[in-house]
């Protein structure tokens, strides 16, 4: 199987952490769309949003998604990539989409343990727990709609990777 694997989910679900290790275990290339975009523009996500607003960032995010999609690649996407209908269809039609699902409490704990305020501007201006709750309520249905595979991301990365590999094996054998 050489189809790209797209990891989707909210901030803190483990897309980058799991993605790097998954790519290594599958002998694939790893790309994080946010990190790729930042390296191309030499700006943080916060700086891009400040300069171009969220709409400008979302347009660049779509271009990044198209640019990094290639066979044998694990792609960690930004949490809001599913907000754009084009991106949802693109991922669904060009690879296997894996939703790393986790409850608000887990996401908040992870985000508080590794704060990245300089890299991730607030979406709502609200306290972190309220923002995560609101954003997940808004996006969960979209994540589920586009996902070929849904994985419980509350476990340790090694367990999450094992579950993804098992789900991929079942998907391929169907």
UniProtKB/Swiss-Prot annotation:
Cofactor: binding comment: Binds 1 Mg(2+) ion per subunit.
Entry-linked InterPro entries: P-loop_NTPase, Shikimate/glucono_kinase, Shikimate_kinase/TSH1, Shikimate_kinase_2, Shikimate_kinase_CS
CDD domains reported for this sequence: SK
Keyword Metal-binding: yes
GO CC annotation, single: cytosol
Residue positions binding substrate: 34, 58, 79, 139
Major location (coarse): cytoplasm
Cofactor(s) needed for function: Mg(2+)
SUPFAM superfamilies for this protein: P-loop containing nucleoside triphosphate hydrolases
A GO molecular-function annotation: ATP binding
This protein's UniProt keywords: Amino-acid biosynthesis, Aromatic amino acid biosynthesis, ATP-binding, Cytoplasm, Kinase, Magnesium, Metal-binding, Nucleotide-binding, Transferase
Pathway annotation: Metabolic intermediate biosynthesis; chorismate biosynthesis; chorismate from D-erythrose 4-phosphate and phosphoenolpyruvate: step 5/7
Subcellular location: Cytoplasm
Annotated binding of Mg(2+), by residue: 16, 32
Subunit structure: Monomer.
Domain text: The LID domain closes over the active site upon ATP binding.
Protein family according to the UniProt entry: Belongs to the shikimate kinase family. AroL subfamily.
Protein name: Shikimate kinase 2
């Amino acid at each position: 199987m050489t189809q790209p694997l797209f990891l989707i989910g909210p901030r803190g679900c483990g897309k980058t952490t799991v993605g790097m290790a998954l790519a290594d275990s599958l002998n694939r290339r790893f790309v994080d769309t946010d990190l790729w975009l930042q390296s191309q523009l030499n700006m943080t996500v916060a700086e891009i949003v400040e300069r171009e607003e969220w709409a400008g960032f979302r347009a660049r995010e779509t271009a990044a998604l198209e640019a990094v999609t290639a066979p044998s690649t694990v792609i960690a996407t930004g949490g809001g990539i599913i907000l754009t209908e084009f991106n949802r269809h693109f991922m669904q039609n060009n690879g296997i989409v894996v939703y790393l699902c986790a409850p608000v409490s887990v996401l908040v704990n992870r985000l508080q343990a590794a704060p990245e305020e300089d890299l991730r501007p607030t979406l709502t201006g609200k306290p972190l727990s309220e923002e995560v709750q609101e954003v997940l309520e808004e996006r969960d249905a979209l994540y589920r709609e586009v996902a070929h595979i849904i994985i419980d991301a509350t476990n340790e990365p090694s367990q999450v990777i094992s579950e993804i590999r098992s789900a991929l094996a079942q998907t391929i054998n169907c």
